[in-house]
C-alpha cells in the first residue's frame, strides 16, 4: 500500500473517540502538547453505546474525581442530564453516589463541540491498521486510508472494537457495536509486537418505543434536586427534567426465557468471551437466581428529542422473536415496540500484567492503554483511565514523571492498582467495596483530595485551585471555632461540635436554631463540615491506617530489579513479581499470588540490594569532598 506521510508530527496521538479517548485527548492538548484524536467515525465521538447515564455506585465518585483533576465528563453531564439522583442517600456518606440520566445525543454533541474548541487538538476520521515502532518505542501509526502519522506517544482506547463480534441468537456478525465496523488490523498489530490478547463479552438491552408503554403499570421514579457532578458548574442552566419508571418481570417472562435458553449464544457455546459478573444478562438472572419470582426493570428515557427508552435490567443475546416475547410478558410492556434489539458483543482486550501503573505498555514504550482494552467495563472507568493515560503520555513526552494516584487518594487509583496487580477473569467494574478507605474517598471531597494534582499538571487553572484552597481554609477554621463555641442547652453548656454530632441535628438545623453563632458558607461547605465532624472518629481511624501503610509504600523497588535472584521467594511469587514489576513494596503486597512471607523475604533482599549502592554513593561523595 502506498502511504502518504502527514506533514505534521504530533506529540501524542489518541486512538478512539469514546469516553476514554475524549478525556485523554483533552488532557494531552490542554497540557500544551500537539495532539491528534483519530476515530473511525466523527459522528460517534462520546457515543453512549449502552445505557444513557453517567455515574452510579462508585462510578459517580470517579466522575467527580475526573472533574477535580481537570477532566470533562462531569461538566458535560451537568449540562446534558435529564434526571439527577443521589443513590444510597439513606446509607452512610461513604457510599452516596451521584447518577444522571443523559440526553445521549446532547451529551455526544456537547462533548464534541468542547473538543473542537481546544487549541493543540486536531480531530480526524481514520481507521488504524498498524502501529509504527522503532527500538521497542512507538513512533506513529498507519491508517486504512493510506496515511501515516508520526508521534512520540499514543493512547489506545479502542473500546469493544478490537475484532468485535455481535451476537443476536443464532446470528452473529462482525462489528465494533451495532451499526459500526470492527477494528481488525489493530488486534493483529498488537499481537505482532508481542502483546497477549484475550476475549471478553458485554451486552446491551433492547430499546423500546415510549408510546408503546403502559405507564399505569409502572412506578414513577423522579429525580433529586441539587445533585451535580462538577465543582465548577454552579448556577448553570439545565435541560428539562424527566422521570424514569420501574416495573418487573413475571413468571411468564422466566418461562419464555428458560424454554428458549438453548437459543442463547451464551448457553449454546457460541460466545467464548467472559461477561461481567455484576451486570448479568436476563438469561443469567433467571438461571442463576431461579428461586427469584421477579426481577426489577428500569425504563430510562434516552433523550428529550427521541421516543427511545432503554430497558435497564434485561440485557440479552436471545433471538429477536424471544426478546419480543419476553418483553411483552411484562404488564407495562404488553404492547411494546422494540426499536433496537438487544445484543451481546465479544471483543479483544490486553491480558493483565502488560501495563504499568502509568498505563504504559511494558513491551512498547510510549504506548498507553485506556478503557475496555484493559479489561474494564463502563463509561466512567474508561474516562478515568483515559484522563490518566492522557496526562502520563503528555508527561512522558515532556520528560516528566508519571502521575500515579494512590489507593488511599482516589477510586481511580484503586482501579488502576487493581488492573496492574490483580489478574482479570471478567470485565472489571468499580464498586465502593473495592476501596479500603471509603470514608476518605467520598464523592463530596474529590476536589480536596485531587485538585492539587490537576493544578500541578496544568489542567486546573489558578482561580479554581485558589477556590479549593479557600474552601479548605474555611472548613478547618470553622471546625476549630465550632469546637470552642459553647451554647446552653437545658442549663448545660455544650460546644457547637457536640450539638452538631447529635444524630437529630444537622448543620442546616443548627443554622436555624442558633443564627447568632452559626455561619452559613453555602450548602456544599456546610455539608462537608458536618460530615467531617460527625464521622471524625472513623475518619481518624482510616487516616491512621493509611499512615501505617505509608512506610511500606515508601520502600521503593528499583526499576529492572530481577526478582528471580531473590533466594527464598516461591516460584509463583517470582513469576508474578517479574511480570507486574511493582514500583514499591505496597504494590507488591497486593499482587495475587504474593504472600506476606514473600514480602518479608523481599524486604530483606531489597535492604541488601541497597547497601552496596548506598556505600558507593557515600564513597563517591567523600571523593568529591
Curated annotation (Swiss-Prot):
Amino-acid positions noted as binding NAD(+) in the UniProt annotation, renumbered to this chain: 275-289
InterPro entries attached to this UniProt entry: FAD/NAD-bd_sf, GIDA_C_N, MnmG, MnmG-rel, MnmG-rel_CS, MnmG_C, MnmG_C_subdom, MnmG_C_subdom_sf
List of residues binding FAD: 16-21, 128, 183, 372
Domain of life from the UniProt record: Bacteria
GO biological process, one term: tRNA wobble uridine modification
Matching SUPFAM superfamilies: FAD/NAD(P)-binding domain (SSF51905)
Record key words, sorted: Cytoplasm, FAD, Flavoprotein, NAD, tRNA processing
Assembly with partners or alone: Homodimer. Heterotetramer of two MnmE and two MnmG subunits.
Homology family: Belongs to the MnmG family.
Entries under PANTHER family matching the protein: GLUCOSE INHIBITED DIVISION PROTEIN A, PROTEIN MTO1 HOMOLOG, MITOCHONDRIAL
Function: NAD-binding protein involved in the addition of a carboxymethylaminomethyl (cmnm) group at the wobble position (U34) of certain tRNAs, forming tRNA-cmnm(5)s(2)U34.
HAMAP family with a match to the protein in the record: MnmG_GidA
Record protein name field: tRNA uridine 5-carboxymethylaminomethyl modification enzyme MnmG
Native source organism of the sequence: Protochlamydia amoebophila (strain UWE25)
Amino acid at each position: 500500500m502506498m502511504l502518504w506521510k502527514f506533514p505534521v508530527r504530533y506529540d501524542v496521538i489518541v486512538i478512539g473517540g469514546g469516553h476514554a479517548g475524549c478525556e485523554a485527548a483533552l488532557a494531552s492538548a490542554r497540557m500544551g502538547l500537539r495532539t491528534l484524536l483519530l476515530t473511525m467515525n466523527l459522528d460517534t465521538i462520546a457515543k453512549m453505546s449502552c445505557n444513557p447515564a453517567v455515574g452510579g455506585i462508585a462510578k459517580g465518585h470517579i466522575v467527580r474525581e475526573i472533574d477535580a483533576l481537570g477532566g470533562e465528563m462531569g461538566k458535560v453531564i451537568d449540562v446534558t442530564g435529564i434526571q439527577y439522583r443521589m443513590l444510597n442517600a439513606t446509607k452512610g456518606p461513604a457510599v452516596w453516589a451521584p447518577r444522571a440520566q443523559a440526553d445521549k445525543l446532547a451529551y455526544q454533541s456537547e462533548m464534541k463541540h468542547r473538543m473542537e474548541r481546544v487549541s493543540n487538538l486536531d480531530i480526524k476520521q481514520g481507521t488504524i491498521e498498524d502501529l509504527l515502532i522503532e527500538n521497542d518505542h512507538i513512533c506513529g501509526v498507519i491508517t486504512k486510508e493510506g496515511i501515516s502519522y508520526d508521534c512520540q506517544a499514543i493512547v489506545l482506547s479502542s473500546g469493544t472494537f478490537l475484532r468485535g463480534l455481535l451476537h443476536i441468537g443464532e446470528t452473529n456478525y462482525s462489528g465494533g457495536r451495532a451499526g459500526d465496523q470492527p477494528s481488525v488490523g489493530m488486534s493483529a498489530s498488537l499481537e505482532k509486537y508481542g502483546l497477549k490478547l484475550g476475549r471478553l463479552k458485554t451486552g446491551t438491552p433492547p430499546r423500546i418505543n415510549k408510546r408503546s408503554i403502559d405507564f399505569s403499570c409502572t412506578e414513577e421514579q423522579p429525580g433529586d434536586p441539587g445533585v451535580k457532578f462538577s465543582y465548577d458548574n454552579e448556577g448553570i442552566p439545565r435541560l428539562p427534567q424527566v422521570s424514569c419508571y420501574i416495573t418487573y418481570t413475571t413468571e411468564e417472562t422466566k418461562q419464555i426465557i428458560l424454554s428458549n435458553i438453548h437459543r442463547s449464544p451464551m448457553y449454546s457455546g457460541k460466545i467464548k468471551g467472559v461477561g461481567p459478573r455484576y451486570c448479568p444478562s436476563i438469561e443469567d438472572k433467571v438461571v442463576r437466581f431461579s428461586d427469584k419470582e421477579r426481577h426489577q426493570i428500569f425504563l430510562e428515557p434516552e433523550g428529550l428529542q427521541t421516543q427511545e427508552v432503554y430497558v435497564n435490567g434485561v440485557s440479552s443475546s436471545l433471538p429477536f422473536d424471544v426478546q419480543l416475547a419476553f418483553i411483552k410478558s411484562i404488564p407495562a410492556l404488553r404492547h411494546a415496540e422494540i426499536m433496537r434489539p438487544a445484543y451481546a458483543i465479544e471483543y479483544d482486550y490486553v491480558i493483565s500484567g502488560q501495563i504499568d501503573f502509568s498505563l504504559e505498555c511494558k513491551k512498547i514504550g510510549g504506548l498507553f492503554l485506556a478503557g475496555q482494552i484493559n479489561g474494564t467495563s463502563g463509561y466512567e472507568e474508561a474516562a478515568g483511565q483515559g484522563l490518566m493515560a492522557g496526562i502520563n503520555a503528555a508527561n512522558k513526552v515532556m520528560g516528566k514523571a508519571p502521575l500515579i494516584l494512590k489507593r488511599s487518594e482516589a477510586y481511580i487509583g484503586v482501579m488502576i492498582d487493581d488492573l496492574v496487580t490483580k489478574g482479570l477473569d471478567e470485565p472489571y467494574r468499580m464498586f465502593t467495596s473495592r476501596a479500603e478507605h471509603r470514608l476518605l474517598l467520598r464523592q463530596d471531597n474529590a476536589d480536596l483530595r485531587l485538585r492539587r494534582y490537576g493544578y500541578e499538571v496544568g489542567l486546573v487553572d489558578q482561580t479554581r485551585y485558589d477556590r479549593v484552597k479557600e474552601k479548605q481554609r474555611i472548613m478547618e477554621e470553622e471546625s476549630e471555632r465550632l469546637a470552642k463555641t459553647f451554647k446552653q442547652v437545658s442549663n448545660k453548656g455544650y460546644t457547637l461540635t457536640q450539638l452538631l454530632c447529635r444524630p437529630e441535628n444537622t448543620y442546616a438545623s443548627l443554622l436555624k436554631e442558633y443564627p447568632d453563632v452559626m455561619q452559613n458558607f453555602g450548602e456544599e461547605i456546610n455539608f462537608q463540615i458536618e460530615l467531617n465532624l460527625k464521622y471524625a472518629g472513623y475518619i481518624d481511624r482510616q487516616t491512621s491506617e493509611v499512615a501505617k501503610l505509608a512506610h511500606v509504600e515508601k520502600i521503593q523497588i528499583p526499576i529492572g530489579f530481577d526478582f528471580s535472584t531473590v533466594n527464598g521467594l516461591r516460584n509463583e511469587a517470582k513469576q508474578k513479581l517479574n511480570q507486574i514489576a511493582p514500583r514499591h513494596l505496597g504494590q507488591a503486597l497486593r499482587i495475587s499470588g504474593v504472600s506476606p512471607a514473600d514480602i518479608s523475604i523481599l524486604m530483606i533482599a531489597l535492604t541488601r540490594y541497597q547497601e552496596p549502592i548506598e556505600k558507593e554513593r557515600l564513597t563517591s561523595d567523600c571523593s568529591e569532598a
